Structures are given as C-alpha cells and as structure tokens.
C-alpha cells in the first residue's frame, strides 16, 4: 500500500519536526534522509512556503514531488516584501510590472486553470488584490481590465507561455 504525506514546508529549510516528522515516523522511513532530499529540491524557493508530497510505497521507497509556492509567496518574493497589506483597500505595499506578473504566471503554469498567458496573468493579478499590490501603478482589478482591452499586447508580444 502506498502512503502519501502532503505538507507545506519552508523552502530549503524543512526539518524533522512537525508537519513532516510526525507524519513520516509511522511509515518507517529515514526521516532525516527524506528531509535532506526535500531541502535539496526546495532550495530555490528559500524564504517561501512550498507544497511537497512525499510518496512512500510498501517497500519503503520514497518519492518526493515539489509543487510551486502559493501565488502570494511568489508575488512577495518579486516585490521583496515579507507580507501583504493588512488593509488592502487603502494600503498599497508594492507595485508589479506587467513583465513580473507574466513571470509569476509562467512559474505557476502547472497549477493554474488557464490555457494562455493572459488568462494566467489575470489569475495572478487576482491574487494581488487582497495583498494590496498594484500592477503598473493601477489597482490589480483595473489592470485586469486594461489587459483585456489589449493595453499590454505590445509588451507581451515576445512573451512565451
């Protein structure tokens, strides 16, 4: 029987404590070894929470799947901030360029429901709203409308999905 443990861990800094240790202990695997593999695979996401899936088969073989961090974490990393606004309607904590939005959308390509770059960018902008993050100096909702109207088509002409 295969067991699956899913957890959100700090990139490159997972440890044998909760949530991994208590979940992996009963499965009889070498927790230290699993944690080292997770840290190796998540090193590029340092400072962000990263979803990981540890799959243990009945022969104690371990497979680790690493997801992408939540969109909010990627946006905060792009802006170099620690947290979003506590008062998103009136407090702005940062401003993304349209290229940064496209970059985050491409990073989330495997996780988003969108079939093209523009739609994925609108999903990213939707995550910016409750964080108090503007895009190109506009409220994220207004920037979504501008994107629909083709305002950024010339900037996105060379952007690949």
Swiss-Prot record:
Q: List the disulfide bonds.
A: none
One GO biological process this protein is involved in is: translation
One matching Pfam family: Ribosomal_L11
Q: Recite the UniProt keywords alphabetically.
A: Ribonucleoprotein, Ribosomal protein, RNA-binding, rRNA-binding
Q: Which Gene3D superfamilies match?
A: Ribosomal protein L11, C-terminal domain, Ribosomal protein L11/L12, N-terminal domain
Which InterPro entries does the entry mention? Ribosomal_uL11 (IPR000911), Ribosomal_uL11_C (IPR020783), Ribosomal_uL11_C_sf (IPR036769), Ribosomal_uL11_N (IPR020784), Ribosomal_uL11_N_sf (IPR036796)
Query: Per the record, what is one GO cellular component?
Result: large ribosomal subunit
MF term (GO), any:
large ribosomal subunit rRNA binding
Complex and partners: Part of the ribosomal stalk of the 50S ribosomal subunit. Interacts with L10 and the large rRNA to form the base of the stalk. L10 forms an elongated spine to which L12 dimers bind in a sequential fashion forming a multimeric L10(L12)X complex.
Family that this chain belongs to: Belongs to the universal ribosomal protein uL11 family.
- PANTHER family cross-referenced by the UniProt entry: 60S RIBOSOMAL PROTEIN L12 (PTHR11661), LARGE RIBOSOMAL SUBUNIT PROTEIN UL11M (PTHR11661:SF1)
What is the role of this chain?
Answer: Forms part of the ribosomal stalk which helps the ribosome interact with GTP-bound translation factors.
Indicate what this protein is called per its UniProt record.
Large ribosomal subunit protein uL11
Instruction: Tell me the organism's taxonomic lineage.
Output: Archaea, Methanobacteriati, Methanobacteriota, Stenosarchaea group, Methanomicrobia
């Amino acid at each position: 029987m295969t067991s699956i443990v899913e957890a959100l861990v700090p990139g490159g800094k997972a440890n044998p404590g909760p949530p991994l240790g208590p979940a992996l202990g009963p499965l009889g695997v070498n927790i230290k070894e699993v944690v080292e593999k997770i840290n190796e695979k998540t090193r590029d996401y340092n400072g962000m929470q990263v979803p990981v899936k540890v799959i243990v088969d009945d022969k104690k073989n371990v497979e680790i799947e690493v997801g992408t961090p939540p969109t909010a974490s990627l946006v905060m990393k792009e802006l170099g901030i620690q947290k979003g606004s506590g008062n998103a309607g009136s407090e702005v904590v940062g401003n993304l360029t349209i290229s940064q939005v496209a970059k985050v959308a491409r990073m989330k390509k495997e996780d988003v429901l969108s079939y093209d770059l523009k739609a994925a960018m609108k999903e990213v902008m939707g995550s910016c709203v409750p964080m108090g993050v503007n895009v190109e100096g506009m409220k994220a909702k207004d920037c979504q409308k501008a994107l629909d109207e083709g305002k950024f088509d010339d900037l996105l002409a060379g952007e690949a999905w």
